[in-house]
Amino acid sequence: MKALAKLERGPGLTLTRVKRPEVGHNDVLIKIRRTAICGTDIHIWKWDDWAQKTIPVPMHVGHEYVGEIVEMGQEVRGFAIGDRVSGEGHITCGFCRNCRAGRRHLCRNTVGVGVNREGAFAEYLAIPAFNAFKIPPEISDDLASIFDPFGNATHTALSFNLVGEDVLITGAGPIGIMAVAIAKHVGARNVVITDINDYRLELARKMGATRAVNVARESLRDVMADLHMTEGFDVGLEMSGVPSAFTSLLEAMNHGGKVALLGIPPAQTAIDWNQVIFKGLEIKGIYGREMFETWYKMVAMLQSGLDLSPIITHRFAADDYEQGFAAMLSGESGKVILDWTV
């Protein structure tokens, strides 16, 4: 089958031919329709320090996808040939304390699809049936293919009650931008997002941001004054991994505020702990998606009117993957979709 793989320990990916995956007793085989390019895939493309330490070579990658079940293992129940599915990209052990307690997103033995094992940038993907998630017919293939990052945004944004709250999001990548739409959808009052990328900030405005702030030119304090905010933000969502962004977020938080961290900062990042202690801030680290509560919430929000369509800005045939990666690398894109049916 056709697949997009890391064949050598260096930058780039190669469209190649690999063996179609075997289907275990508890697996489903998915014929891929669409995939989306993730920030993780950009790290793999660039072959940065993280990728060099993490990605086995050779291996085909990718973990954001939608497709159709074409084969099932003999032990699989609850699915049928022809079901349209996306899937949870974190394959968990099922035996550790967190797995047995229903907190599988905190499994200490997680294996990542397209990171630690063969991925979805291919014509077929085999995964445990437990990880597959049926997609309702009213949700498009394009939207279903981005359920993985949509899930990151959902898990982060819905970690705290947002109804009537003022929310600050630092980092206008696709996940941060989707968090804007989620926060507005569930009833936040002001949703402010910060970045230095004007293209992405404009996308955030289209997705409903009260203010999209280029902090290279505009003061967050001035924006808060314009919005008649006198006590700071109630909820902060750190999506960038940039230390200066986290610092500004802590400074802008109200006393008793709540902060969710999804962005991954450099190791040993220093912060002003006085901001945390004397403001009584609650800080929560976010990893992946809650299995499968996050997935049900994603579907429910889309079915109740959440519009994520502006975040998908580019579409290419899988054979034109280099154009897709170029769009992502340019910084002037939202989500980029690769079509495996053409």
Swiss-Prot record:
Binding site for Zn(2+) 2: 93, 96, 99, 107
PROSITE patterns documented for this protein: ADH_ZINC
The protein's required cofactors: Zn(2+)
UniProt site (Important for catalytic activity for the proton relay mechanism but does not participate directly in the coordination of zinc atom): 148
Cofactor binding note from Swiss-Prot or TrEMBL: Binds 2 Zn(2+) ions per subunit.
GO cellular component terms, A-Z: cytoplasm
Keywords of the record: Cytoplasm, Metal-binding, NAD, Oxidoreductase, Zinc
Annotated catalytic residues: 40 (charge relay system), 43 (charge relay system)
SMART domains linked to this entry: PKS_ER (SM00829)
Subcellular location: Cytoplasm
Pfam family, one: ADH_zinc_N
Pathway: Amino-acid degradation; L-threonine degradation via oxydo-reductase pathway; glycine from L-threonine: step 1/2
UniProt xrefs under PANTHER family: L-THREONINE 3-DEHYDROGENASE (PTHR43401:SF2)
Protein known as: L-threonine 3-dehydrogenase
Organism from which the protein derives: Burkholderia cenocepacia (strain ATCC BAA-245 / DSM 16553 / LMG 16656 / NCTC 13227 / J2315 / CF5610)
Name of the gene encoding the protein in the UniProt record: tdh
